[in-house]
C-alpha cells in the first residue's frame, strides 16, 4: 500500500495495538519477530525495543550503520516525549504545514518525526516503552513495526 495513513488510522493503530502485559520476555519476542520479518524480506534494518527506561532488545543487521542507531534514538525520544508514533507526529506536522524539526522547542539532534518508532502501551496502564526500526523509507519502517506488533499481540492473546 503506497497511500499515506490518515491521522485517524495512525491513532487507531495506537489504540488497538496495546498489550495486556509487557515484560522483558515480550520485548525479546517482539525484537525477534522484527528480525524475522526483516530477514524474510531481505531488508537491512536496525531494531530496538526500549521499555522500563532500558534497552531490552537491540539488533543491527549486517549492512546497517551507526547512523541507524542515531535515527533510532531520535525516533524513540520523539515517542517518549509526545506519546505518539513518530510517523503520526510527522504526518500531524505535515497536515499543519510545518516542519517538526524546525520548531523552536525541538532540538533536531534529539528528536525527529520520521516513521519507525511506535509506543508500547499496556492496556489500562499507559506508555511503558517504544519499539523502533530504522533503515527503510519511513512508511516501511512504520509498517514493519505494525506488522510485528499485530502478529505478536494476536499470538499473546491466544495463549
From Swiss-Prot:
NCBIfam families: PRK02487.1-5 (NF002696). Belongs to the UPF0303 family. This is UPF0303 protein Ping_1243.
Amino acid at each position: 500500500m503506497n497511500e499515506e495513513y490518515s491521522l485517524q488510522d495512525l491513532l487507531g493503530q495506537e489504540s488497538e495495538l496495546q498489550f495486556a502485559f509487557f515484560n522483558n520476555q515480550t520485548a525479546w519476542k517482539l525484537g525477534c519477530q522484527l528480525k524475522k520479518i526483516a530477514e524474510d524480506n531481505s531488508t537491512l534494518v536496525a531494531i530496538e525495543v526500549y521499555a522500563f527506561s532500558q534497552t531490552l532488545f537491540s539488533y543491527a543487521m549486517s549492512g546497517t550503520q551507526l547512523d541507524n542507531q542515531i535515527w533510532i534514538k531520535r525516533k524513540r525520544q520523539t515517542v517518549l516525549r509526545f506519546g505518539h508514533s513518530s510517523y503520526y507526529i510527522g504526518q500531524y506536522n505535515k497536515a499543519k504545514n510545518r516542519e517538526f524539526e524546525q520548531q523552536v522547542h525541538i532540538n533536531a539532534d534529539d528528536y525527529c518525526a520520521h516513521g519507525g518508532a511506535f509506543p508500547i502501551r499496556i492496556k489500562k496502564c499507559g506508555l511503558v516503552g517504544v519499539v523502533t526500526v530504522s533503515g527503510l523509507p519511513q512508511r516501511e519502517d512504520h509498517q514493519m513495526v505494525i506488522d510485528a506488533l499485530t502478529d505478536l499481540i494476536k499470538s499473546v492473546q491466544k495463549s
